Amino acid sequence: MGFYNSGGYSGNSGYSNGFGSSFALIVVLFILLIIVGAAIFNY
């Protein structure tokens, strides 16, 4: 995934461990942004 390589969320030490958590974090933030954006545009 390009997001992880460019971001370098957990660095070299926790690469295998941090991949899943950082990816989940990005997905959750993205979903929250979409929900908030939809709420703002609707009102």
UniProtKB/Swiss-Prot annotation:
It is found in: Membrane. This is Uncharacterized membrane protein YuzJ. NCBIfam families: tiny_TM_bacill. The keyword Transmembrane helix applies. It comes from the Bacteria. Belongs to the SscA family. Keywords: Membrane, Transmembrane, Transmembrane helix. GO terms for cellular component: membrane. It comes from Bacillus subtilis (strain 168). InterPro entries: YjcZ-like. The chain crosses the membrane at residues 21-41. It is a single-pass membrane protein. Pfam families: YjcZ_2. The keyword Membrane applies.
